[in-house]
Amino acid sequence: MSITAAQVKELRELSGAGMMDCKAALMETNGDIETAVDWLRKKGMAKADKKAGRTAAEGLIGIASKGLSAVVVEVNSETDFVARNDAFQTIVRNVATAALDTEGSVESVSASIYPGSEKTVEEAIKDAIGTIGENMAFRRSAKLSVQNGAVATYIHNSVADGLGKLGVLVGIETTGDKEVAVDFARKVAMHIAATNPLALTVADVDASIVEREKAIFSDQARQSGKPENIIEKMVEGRIRKFYEEVVLLSQAFVMNPDVTVEASLKDAEKMIGAPAKITGFVRFALGEGVEKEEVDFAAEVAAAAKG
């Protein structure tokens, strides 16, 4: 089959492998990008990608909090120009505010009342599309609540209050000092923004992901020619390392890389004055997993000339 330069470029960006290696991988996997990444990894030519996903959508991430709950939403626009528009930013902020009084799903938020009006969120967004003159979409939403403690929030590279390109929520349960607890949880939120963990604990990691990693590590280890019992130990070691890379509590804390997030939490309990537990987190990066349509500029000009 014919492999395009665009496919090779995309695989290089995802895998960090060389151009010819990427081309060979695509030929071997009939042009399937995700399978090609695995093929390269088995050959030892690519790095592990914790969350492969093409990021291309414009828009904003919005965060709002109230009491023991916080929400994070993503609203997409077609261009970054509109995302910088005050009217669009107001919409994202109001969608986040509306989400606080729901259970957090896109469906429930869309059906809720848009702040300051009698319309639903869905209706308000449709009206805004007509006013702003550009398509927009309320793509996703999540809510995090605690029973006794706090939910810390963090926006990376904020463009306005509660708005940016990446947002994180972290729940922390404790009966101790809430201000100290939320300050620590916010540092954990900054850590999550930087490291993008897959799960809170080892038990939370999707079993299919672990099996996939084991298969890749086994293939890599067998290339060493070592006996099966040694290969088994090598794979166990690689899986332990994998958990240290993708599990929040097992990761080296960005604020103090000499200790894990879990150990840092134990340390923080002394200042909090009571046991504390991170109960969950949510991380939204703008456009995660969305592939933007690529426009052939020459074809677009030709079409315009014809018509």
Swiss-Prot record:
GO terms for molecular function: translation elongation factor activity. Residues 79-82 are annotated as: Involved in Mg(2+) ion dislocation from EF-Tu. Pfam families: EF_TS. It is found in: Cytoplasm. Its main location: cytoplasm. It comes from the Bacteria. Keywords: Cytoplasm, Elongation factor, Protein biosynthesis. One of its GO terms (cellular component) is cytoplasm. Associates with the EF-Tu.GDP complex and induces the exchange of GDP to GTP. It remains bound to the aminoacyl-tRNA.EF-Tu.GTP complex up to the GTP hydrolysis stage on the ribosome. HAMAP family: EF_Ts (MF_00050). Belongs to the EF-Ts family. This is Elongation factor Ts. It comes from Bartonella bacilliformis (strain ATCC 35685 / KC583 / Herrer 020/F12,63). The gene is tsf.
